[in-house]
């Protein structure tokens, strides 16, 4: 287990689920497009993700409509969409019946191995206390914020020349910041479509 610095109420073991469907098994579902500052250090252009918005919203069963307006010099009003999708329920049969997908359960990706420090030769996994090596032409690491960092950090620990030491892997992660912004009385005649919490 990793050491938690700061918020003692945060429990990393409950912030992600190691199960088929991942953290969507208990996520809140609040969704919105990323801001420019979210991908500042990524090898992406500002609008490169825009072409994927429609398909992403279809996957999440939400409308591709996100209003954003400026309230003042310091505050913006941002609209979220709520998704109740559980990926295990939605895609289980599709994945099991696919001829192009091999579903491997009860197996944990430990780290990537590279002998030339330029590309991944294979992924080393642990299954039933035995080591498995998985080779592929391409690897897409999509295990979520905590697991991606853990895998990359352990890969760097095994081979410090493969992953740049200066990359801020595993830094700046935090749990949902919750704040009680205020309490008010709602006029029933006004729009009451929003019924969630504020993150």
Question: Locations of the language-model features?
Answer:
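A glycine- and small-aliphatic-rich helix-loop capping segment at beta-alpha/alpha-beta transitions
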Residues: 31-37, 156-161
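Short, solvent-exposed loop/turn segments at secondary-structure junctions
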Residues: 24-25, 31-33, 110, 145-147
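Glycine-rich loop(s) and the adjacent beta-strand/alpha-helix scaffold that form part
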Residues: 1, 112, 123-196
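Conserved redox-cofactor binding core of oxidoreductases
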Residues: 36-39, 43-120
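A short alpha-helix-loop-beta-strand transition element characteristic
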Residues: 6-12, 17, 62-69, 161-168
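Short His-Asn-centered micro-motif
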Residues: 22, 105-106, 141-143
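N-terminal FAD cofactor-binding segment of flavoenzymes
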Residues: 1-31, 45-56
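FAD-binding core/adjacent interface of flavoenzyme oxidoreductases
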Residues: 18, 25, 106-111, 125-129
